[in-house]
UniProtKB/Swiss-Prot annotation:
This is Protein GVQW3. Pfam families: HTH_48. It comes from the Eukaryota. Disulfide bonds: none annotated. It comes from Homo sapiens. The lineage of its organism: Eukaryota, Metazoa, Chordata, Craniata, Vertebrata.
Length: 254
């Protein structure tokens, strides 16, 4: 219970002893506490209780889990839990810490300044310490499997997204340079892969993982051609072939 409400209940009890009516008591509280005054219904309810002989100004004991407050200890517990797993819901955190959901929600919102983010955004977010190491590992893979010129010429970023109901063997791919907005080039010359992709500039999210795994397979060849206004990129390994399709990039003149 808030301290200011406890103080107002004591004031109501004092007004009852002075034989003040419920309306007069509410008017006096409104003048004294302004916007923080208790509601009219609550003032009348407590006025009636004290008039009937009640002495205790605190709430009656309730069954169930006790209500907890936003103490420093609880705030630290919520912070540690949400940092260990950011996919937990408010309900799951409340059950884990044995707190009520409203307390957890207020701690997240007011004390930790956190808010819910769509899962579509979270899928591409890495921990603060991950991008550097992932970028370095991806660059090592590129250098170890291809000529040195590949790492020196790469200057873009790959991001991939899937249809809601993707067809087998077909994916939407978005090739875009992070610095200039250009579409990265993909081609194959005598079995050697060349792509404008760099682990240094990329944000190294989930699509980059997929790219590294994709190109780390055995010998494969990739060719591209334009048909019906779409860019088709074909990757084949022996008798197997995977088809990637992308809408043509529209250049905007500034």
């Amino acid at each position: 219970m808030s301290d200011r409400y406890l103080e107002q209940r004591i004031s109501i009890k004092f007004c009852v002893k002075l034989n003040k009516s419920a309306s007069e008591t509410h008017h006096l509280l409104k003048e004294a506490y302004g916007d923080e005054v208790m509601s009219r219904a609550r003032v009348f309810d407590w006025h009636k209780r004290f008039k009937e002989g009640r002495e205790d100004v605190r709430d009656d004991a309730r069954s169930g889990r006790p209500v907890t407050h936003r103490t420093d200890d609880n705030i630290q517990k919520v912070k540690d839990l949400v940092c260990s797993n950011r996919q937990l819901t408010v309900r799951m955190m409340a059950e884990e810490l044995n707190l009520d959901k409203e307390t957890v929600r207020l701690i997240l919102k007011e004390n930790l300044n956190m808010r819910k983010i769509s899962a579509k955004v979270i899928s591409g977010v890495l921990k603060e310490t991950e991008p550097h190491y992932v970028a370095q590992a991806g660059l090592e893979l590129l250098v170890s499997r291809d000529p040195p010129t590949l790492a020196s010429q790469s200057s873009g970023i790959i991001s991939m997204s899937h249809h809601a109901k993707p067809k087998p063997g077909v994916q939407w791919c978005k090739f875009q340079s992070e610095s200039t907005g250009r579409r990265a080039r993909s081609a194959d010359v005598q079995g050697q892969e060349k792509m404008d992709v760099t682990a240094q500039e990329a944000r190294t999210n989930l699509p980059f993982y997929l790219f590294v795994l994709f190109r780390s397979s055995m010998n494969w060849m990739m060719s591209m051609h334009i048909r019906e206004g779409c860019l088709f990129i074909t990757r084949s390994t022996n008798s197997n072939a995977n088809l990637f399709r992308k809408h043509p990039h529209r250049h905007t003149q500034k």
